[in-house]
Amino acid sequence: GRDRRQRQMCIRDRWKMGTKNLIDSASLMNKALEIIEAKWLFDLKSEQIDVIIHPQSIIHSMVETKDNSILSVMSEPDMKICIAYGLGFPRKIKSLSKPLSLIENNLLEFINIDQIDFPSIKFARDALTSGGLMPAVLNAANEIAVEKFINNEIKFDLIFDTIKHVMEKFDKENFKIDPSLEQILEANEKARLLSLNYICLLYTSDAADDLF
């Protein structure tokens, strides 16, 4: 089932960025948050942003020029390269990462996203449609749910259930088009509390079911 497949995805930690980022990669929440980032960075609408998965993590960016050629950045999936780029920009400085071998990495795959199998993408698009505080709500609910999963308190699929529940609760409220920082922080705390309460209710329900 999906839970087993997602756990298998977690095994391959190419970037070595820690457990939280590993789970977000398995659930595609990292891509969901990148949809929101792209909207603000490039002033795009949700429908202008497509998502594909590149399992090998070799190509890190691509830019298509007006002659339909594509410029790409390729390297080993190693954060040391990214850090060296940030520290040295606009110059290139030597990193401690190994060189990329195109012989060893001769298979480059690109996979379309299925929103049914990966609800995180739909959550991101719904958050952009709702606007206002919803992206902050999405992020907060995910952080709590992932924390509970890492602590073996919930199953993987309940990450999605928790986020969906919290977003639906918030969707019934009024959102400001341009919320203040104070309002964003308040929504963040409220979403975290709603997530904890929802998970607690699931535990209570499961415990009651075990009695009968």
Feature roles, as predicted:
Residues 4-8, 12-29:
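Conserved anion/nucleotide-ligand pocket segment
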Residues 24, 34, 45, 134, ...:
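Helix N-cap / loop-to-helix initiation motif
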Residues 40-141:
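C-terminal substrate-binding/catalytic lobe of Rossmann-fold NAD(P)-dependent dehydrogenases
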Residues 1-7, 11, 203-212:
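Single conserved hydrophobic/aromatic residue that forms the stacking wall/gate
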